[in-house]
Regions:
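Extracellular beta-strand-rich recognition modules
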Residues: 55-76, 84, 116-125
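Extracellular carbohydrate recognition and processing domains
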Residues: 90-114
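Extracellular calcium-associated, cysteine-rich motifs in secreted modular proteins
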Residues: 144-180
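Extracellular glycan-recognition surfaces and repeat-rich motifs
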Residues: 1-45
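Short beta-strands within extracellular/lumenal beta-sheet-rich domains
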Residues: 38-39, 44-69, 105-106
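Extracellular carbohydrate recognition
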Residues: 48-54, 125-143
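Short, surface-exposed beta-strand/strand-loop-strand elements in extracellular ectodomains
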Residues: 83-90
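Extracellular acidic, Ser/Thr/Pro-rich low-complexity tracts
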Residues: 32, 76-78
């Protein structure tokens, strides 16, 4: 019903719909990002290490979008967190690995324009049950202007609504606490 489906032949684990925590202590989210809806996640209890779970989109037509992007929230909390990848037409275009804390983070990735694209999220389990990763709020649209949103940065962009991690401060340093 939502345009996403689990890969059935090329992986060995599935994404699951949930809404109030993954059931394992010290891993996964406690709620979806808006607190009250659903998210999808990989339940790694009993999965074993280095198992792959892939969720696919139906083909997405980007011809009517000026600057097509996919925006999504992800949660990667757990001591033995694995890797989350975004693939577009079978090519990895974004990847995160390791424990990123008990928080929802948001990413926005450009998509090819004037085409039909297949979007996939692939989760690779870590070495133990504390590698439950989750996805929420998956949206394909013209995107939100991205750039440096820190007013103290040398390259602050007043039109940016999403921080893209490009902020520079002193002599090209990306650490806002730098004194050099």
């Amino acid at each position: 019903g939502n345009g996403w489906y689990n890969e059935s032949t090329l992986d060995n684990w599935d994404w699951t719909v949930d809404n109030f925590g993954t059931g394992s202590f010290g891993t996964g989210p406690g709620n979806d990002i808006t607190i009250g809806g659903n998210y999808i996640y990989t339940e790694t209890s009993g999965a074993g290490s280095n198992k792959t779970a892939t969720v696919n989109s139906l083909c997405v037509n980007t011809t009517n979008l000026t600057t097509p992007n996919i925006r999504f929230s992800y949660h990667m909390f757990g001591a033995t967190m694995g890797t989350l990848e975004l693939l577009v037409d079978d090519v990895v275009v974004w990847s995160q690995s390791g424990n990123l804390g008990d928080q929802w983070l948001t990413a926005q990735i450009p998509l090819p324009s004037d085409s039909n694209v297949l979007i996939q999220f692939r989760g690779l389990t870590g070495t133990s049950f504390t590698s439950d990763m989750a996805l929420d709020e998956l949206v394909v649209d013209d995107g939100i202007p991205a750039g440096c949103t820190d007013t103290l940065a040398a390259n602050y962009s007043p039109t940016a609504s999403v921080d893209d991690g490009s902020c520079t401060y002193v002599l090209g340093c990306t650490d806002s606490t730098a004194n050099n």
